[in-house]
Design a protein with these regions (language model features):
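Conserved C-terminal helix/tail region of periplasmic/extracytoplasmic solute-binding proteins
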Residues: 302-343
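Sec/Tat signal peptide C-region and signal peptidase I cleavage site
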Residues: 29-33
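Short, glycine-/small- and polar/acidic-enriched structural segments
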Residues: 34-182, 186-192, 205-209, 214, ...
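Ligand-binding clefts/hinges and TM-proximal coupling segments of bilobed small-molecule sensing domains
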Residues: 147-165, 240-273, 318, 327-336
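Extracytoplasmic/secreted envelope proteins and their assembly/folding machinery
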Residues: 50, 81, 96, 150, ...
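Pocket-lining segment of extracytoplasmic ligand-binding domains
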Residues: 175-267
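Secondary-structure end/capping motifs
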Residues: 232-313
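Short, basic, low-complexity termini and linkers enriched in Ser/Thr/Gly/Pro
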Residues: 1-13, 17, 23-27
């Protein structure tokens, strides 16, 4: 089964042209108050962690909340950040280290919701490796240095006091999987549904998402980000996007046939067993109240500084609160929205 993530993937120039058109109609819709506010919404990855937005879009939950969301799969968080800073979009679906790097470089893109506030990766290895100590002297593939796959692996190795592992930057999840299949690496850090595909190929899940959670390390694998300047002046739009996302999460967990249909459509999964496992994943791994864990943002920042991927001096003078804003989720909580949604 081919899990290469090419669906909905646009060349950057085409994407920028598309989002400029979306941005140009925001102001009139806000003034008239008659039509849904049209906004570009870049997101990634094309995987199970993005399903709430797909379900919300396909089920008209964004429109119900007064926003006409133009969903554009980009996939690479750094590209999304760069485009947002250029004004091509003001709100997006992503999470993780890219937000930290952006703020420390003077950008104003912050995390405003955490739909998946923990690691959801698995460490897949050759079947001959049966314990964590078997990684010594081996090569493990990740997507990019400083990405979620990298930080998950480093946290795992550090907690198990394993140092002699070669970490190889593969480029993307498809490349990491290919490296494992071809034998160029002994292990790869991947996310569902790729985990399920590798299991069917005979590889071993040495470390599961549950094992990573037991490490007690918070992480924002996915969520919603926004430019602080936009969020401050367009608070109602941000609240509506978060509401639609939460409603998509609820519908996704409650309507198994619909969810499986959309997983099959967008992720090209047709195998009944993989569809079932994918549904179990999305029904169990999303936050009902998508608060951003402050400790997770702090841990990510510290890890990036230790890896020299961000300016450590800048981090020392930057308060942790500069990376996120939980006031939007808190406002929805205080209004009783989440309690009513999940009762």
């Amino acid at each position: 089964m081919d899990f290469r993530l090419s669906i909905l993937d646009f060349p950057l120039k085409s994407w920028l042209a598309r989002v400029v058109l979306s941005v140009s109609v925001i102001a009139p819709s806000l003034v008239s108050g008659q039509q849904p506010t049209k906004i570009p919404f870049p997101y990634g990855p094309m995987g199970l962690n993005s399903m709430p937005w797909i379900v919300a879009k396909e089920s008209n939950l964004f429109a119900k909340n007064g926003v006409d969301v133009d969903m554009i799969f980009v996939g690479v968080s750094t590209v999304m950040i760069q485009s947002m800073l250029s004004g091509a979009a003001n709100i997006a679906g992503l999470g993780g280290p890219a937000v930290i790097s952006n703020v420390l470089k003077g950008g104003d893109i912050i995390q405003i919701a955490a739909t998946v506030p923990y690691f959801t990766q698995s460490l897949m290895v050759r079947p001959q490796i049966s314990e964590i100590g078997g990684l010594r002297g081996k090569k493990v593939g990740i997507t990019r240095f400083g990405a979620v796959t990298d930080l998950a692996l480093r946290a795992l190795l550090e907690r198990n006091n394993i140092k002699d592992v070669t970490i190889l930057q593969m480029g993307g999840l498809a490349e990491a999987m290919a490296g494992l299949s071809k034998g160029s690496v002994d292990g790869a850090v991947v996310s569902p549904p790729h985990t399920l595909s590798l299991l069917k190929q005979g590889f071993r899940e040495l470390v599961s998402p549950g094992d990573l959670r037991k490490l007690g390390i918070g992480f924002v694998t996915n969520g919603i980000v926004a430019r602080r300047s936009f969020a401050s002046s367009n608070r109602n739009i941000v609240l509506r996007v978060i509401k639609a996302t939460a409603e998509g999460t609820k519908l996704m967990t409650a309507n198994e046939p619909l969810t499986k249909k959309l997983i099959s459509k967008y992720l090209h999964i047709d195998d009944p067993e993989l569809l079932h496992q994918s549904y179990l994943y999305v029904s169990e791994n999303f936050a009902r109240e998508p608060f951003v864990p402050p400790g997770a943002m702090q841990w990510m920042a510290q890890q990036l500084a230790q890896m020299n991927l961000v300016d450590a001096k800048a981090l020392q003078t930057t308060p942790n609160s500069a990376f996120f804003d939980n006031s939007f989720v808190e406002e929805l909580k205080q209004s009783g929205f989440f309690e009513s949604l999940w009762k």
